Each structure stands twice: as structure tokens, then as C-alpha cells.
A protein has these predicted regions:
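Positively charged n-region of N-terminal signal peptides that target proteins for export
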Residues: 1-4, 8
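C-terminal motif of bacterial Sec signal peptides marking the signal peptidase cleavage site
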Residues: 16-19
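Acidic, small-residue rich beta-repeat scaffolds with periodic aromatic anchors
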Residues: 21-71, 75, 156-237
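Acidic, divalent-cation-chelating loop motifs in proteins
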Residues: 71-82, 120-128
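Acidic/hydrophobic-patterned starts of short beta strands in beta-sheet-rich repeat architectures
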Residues: 79-87, 127-137, 188-195
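Short loop/turn segments immediately following the C-termini of beta-strands
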Residues: 91, 138, 200
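Structural motif
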Residues: 95-97, 142-151, 205-208
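A short beta-strand motif characteristic of beta-propeller blades
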Residues: 105-112, 160
Length: 237
């Protein structure tokens, strides 16, 4: 009986240790809860950004809209702001989304007819020492679709990794998050990072299309590097 009690006690201790070592919450590598997230949406550095691009009248299907300070917001995610000097700006009427990188302005995603920029995480996918951007966005008024892409900050080119228009659920909204398992006995810097893609419900706050909140509805896959190229890996692979 004493031996049985000892075995049971040992089992309980081992289970308790395992529970302490493994992080099972829905947090990204920065400790943010990925179940419910809100975009950063401020006026920080907007005047500086507008002094670079100037006020622009839009034409075509966007006639009547313009890139002006009134509709411009800084939507740089915290992880991007703390790890890089990149600033991301979005216009609340047209959803046009632009990045300020090393004093130059670049378009990082399509926007017409969708939310444009949704969110991004920094990721040196090609290991060249420069952090790139893994971006979630959407566009398309006739056929709403979400795009997962990588903006290479060295070549200033965008690589589409996943396009929902080719799937059986083209209108699903997406966001990205960098996640890593957490073990109390290890330095977090030594843990592998997983770049996950979540399906989401997106809400517009205060009729401002630059100010979004999104709630995760599930993990649909992850973005990994194969032969130097970022690729999307579905959950069922």
C-alpha cells in the first residue's frame, strides 16, 4: 500500500511539473492574447509622414478620396515598433496602407474594397539580418479576399504567401501572430517561433477603417520557410 501511495504521489508531481512548464494559453511570443486583438491606431508621426508624401487626390474608383492628414493614422503594431524603425500608416477612408522604411514610402498591400492592412509581425525570414514584415491584409469589393504576404525590407518587394480567393472560403478574414511554446526552464530567446495564421471576425471601431478589432475563430495554418522561400502550411498538412 505504501509503495502504491508513493507511485501515485510521484505521478501527481510529474503531472504538476508538466503543467508548470508548458504554456497552454493563447498568447503570442510577446504575451499578447491572440484571441482578441486591436490594432494600434494613433496620430503619432502622422504629420512627419504627410510632410513626406504630401496631400494626394485619388482618381479612378477612389475619386473623391484623398491621402490627407485628417484620414491618416499610425497603425504600426507594437512588435514592429519595438523591434524595428518601420512605421505603418493607413488612411481611414480608402484603407490605403503604406510603410515608412528608411525615409522612403512603400505600399505593403492591396486595399481597394477591403480592410487593407490588418496586422503584421516582424520576421527575418531570409536570415539576412534585416527584419521583414509578415502581413495580413484584405481587398476586393467584388470578391473579398484575404492575403498573407511577406514584405522584404531589403528588396522592398512583397511576396504573396496565401490568397483566400483560391480556397473554398474566399471571404474569410485573417490575421497573423508569432507564437512560441513557453517552458519555465528555458530562456524564451532560445525557443522556436511559429508564425501562425488565424481566421478572425473583424470589427471596425467608431466607423474608422484604420481602427480594427479582431477575434480569433481558429488557427488555419502557419508560415514557414522552405528552400529560402516563405510558404503557407495548412493545419491539416
Amino acid at each position: 500500500m505504501k509503495r502504491l501511495f508513493c507511485l501515485l504521489l510521484t505521478g501527481i508531481v510529474l503531472i504538476s511539473l508538466a503543467a508548470c512548464q508548458t504554456n497552454t494559453d493563447n498568447s503570442d511570443k510577446n504575451g499578447n492574447n491572440v484571441d482578441n486583438m486591436t490594432t494600434s491606431c494613433t496620430k503619432d508621426s502622422v504629420d512627419e509622414f504627410m510632410s513626406i508624401i504630401g496631400e494626394v487626390e485619388l482618381g479612378g474608383l477612389s475619386t473623391g478620396m484623398k491621402l490627407d492628414e485628417e484620414h491618416c493614422y499610425n497603425v504600426t503594431p507594437l512588435s514592429v515598433a519595438t523591434q524595428t524603425d518601420i512605421k505603418i500608416f493607413k488612411f481611414s477612408d480608402s484603407c490605403i496602407s503604406l510603410a515608412l522604411i528608411d525615409g522612403e514610402v512603400y505600399s505593403i498591400c492591396e486595399s481597394f474594397g477591403g480592410y487593407g492592412f490588418v496586422n503584421a509581425v516582424p520576421w527575418d525570414y531570409d536570415e539576412d539580418g534585416n527584419l521583414d514584415l509578415l502581413v495580413a491584409s484584405s481587398w476586393g469589393s467584388g470578391l473579398h479576399r484575404s492575403i498573407i504576404s511577406v514584405f522584404n525590407t531589403t528588396t522592398k518587394e512583397s511576396i504573396v504567401v496565401y490568397d483566400t480567393s483560391t480556397t473554398d472560403n474566399p471571404s474569410v478574414d485573417l490575421f497573423v501572430a508569432a507564437a512560441s511554446p513557453s517552458f519555465s526552464s528555458k530562456d524564451p530567446q532560445d525557443l522556436p517561433v511559429y508564425y501562425q495564421v488565424y481566421s478572425a471576425n473583424i470589427e471596425v471601431n467608431g466607423n474608422n477603417l484604420a481602427d480594427l478589432s479582431y477575434t480569433a475563430t481558429g488557427v488555419i495554418g502557419s508560415v514557414v520557410v522552405e528552400n529560402g522561400t516563405p510558404v503557407f502550411k495548412p493545419m491539416d498538412d
